[in-house]
From Swiss-Prot:
Zn(2+) binds at C57, C60, H77, C84. Ubiquitinated by the Cul9-RING ubiquitin-protein ligase complex, leading to its degradation. Ubiquitination is required for centrosomal targeting. Deubiquitinated by USP35 or USP38; leading to stabilization. In vitro phosphorylation at Thr-117 by AURKB prevents interaction with INCENP and localization to mitotic chromosomes. Phosphorylation at Thr-48 by CK2 is critical for its mitotic and anti-apoptotic activities. Phosphorylation at Thr-34 by CDK15 is critical for its anti-apoptotic activity. Phosphorylation at Ser-20 by AURKC is critical for regulation of proper chromosome alignment and segregation, and possibly cytokinesis. Monomer or homodimer. Exists as a homodimer in the apo state and as a monomer in the CPC-bound state. The monomer protects cells against apoptosis more efficiently than the dimer. Only the dimeric form is capable of enhancing tubulin stability in cells. When phosphorylated, interacts with LAMTOR5/HBXIP; the resulting complex binds pro-CASP9, as well as active CASP9, but much less efficiently. Expressed only in fetal kidney and liver, and to lesser extent, lung and brain. Abundantly expressed in adenocarcinoma (lung, pancreas, colon, breast, and prostate) and in high-grade lymphomas. Also expressed in various renal cell carcinoma cell lines. Expressed in cochlea including the organ of Corti, the lateral wall, the interdental cells of the Limbus as well as in Schwann cells and cells of the cochlear nerve and the spiral ganglions (at protein level). Not expressed in cells of the inner and outer sulcus or the Reissner's membrane (at protein level). Changing C84A: Loss of cytoprotection. Keywords: Acetylation, Apoptosis, Cell cycle, Cell division, Centromere, Chromosome, Chromosome partition, Cytoplasm, Cytoskeleton, Host-virus interaction, Kinetochore, Metal-binding, Microtubule, Mitosis, Nucleus, Phosphoprotein, Protease inhibitor, Repressor, Thiol protease inhibitor, Transcription, Transcription regulation, Ubl conjugation, Zinc. Changing T34A: Loss of LAMTOR5 binding. CDD domains: BIR. This is Baculoviral IAP repeat-containing protein 5.
Length: 142
């Protein structure tokens, strides 16, 4: 019987899992932002057609793109999301106590809810603008 695996929601806490997301990452050897260093800084690679180097912190959900070979992932993370609790964790995942892990997971869940709420708010605001324009166009017809 093999070692138990973590539920998918917790796998990003593992550095090896984060490294595995960096397929087709443009910066490998001789660069500051290698997959290993990106993963150490908490990033996962989530490329899109228009943003092939898009990376997101699995913890605070901050997305960064436009990476340069000499960008330091930790410094970029601190610069763009200084309040990310992952940056202050001094232990490897495997060294955390259950209490420490659950506290981190609760913080991550709050971050995820905040990100999703913000996305829904933006989506609603965009829809509201379109509806307002349509109403104004209808009113102008009279």
């Amino acid at each position: 019987m093999g070692a138990p695996t973590l539920p998918p929601a917790w796998q990003p806490f593992l550095k090896d899992h984060r490294i595995s997301t960096f397929k087709n990452w443009p910066f490998l050897e001789g660069c500051a932002c290698t997959p290993e260093r990106m993963a150490e800084a908490g990033f996962i690679h989530c490329p899109t057609e228009n943003e092939p180097d898009l990376a997101q912190c699995f913890f605070c959900f901050k997305e960064l793109e436009g990476w340069e070979p000499d960008d330091d992932p930790i410094e970029e993370h601190k610069k763009h999301s200084s309040g990310c609790a992952f940056l202050s964790v001094k232990k490897q995942f495997e060294e955390l106590t259950l209490g420490e892990f659950l506290k981190l997971d609760r913080e991550r869940a709050k971050n995820k809810i905040a990100k999703e709420t913000n996305n829904k708010k933006k989506e609603f605001e965009e829809t509201a603008k379109k509806v307002r324009r349509a109403i104004e166009q209808l009113a102008a017809m009279d």
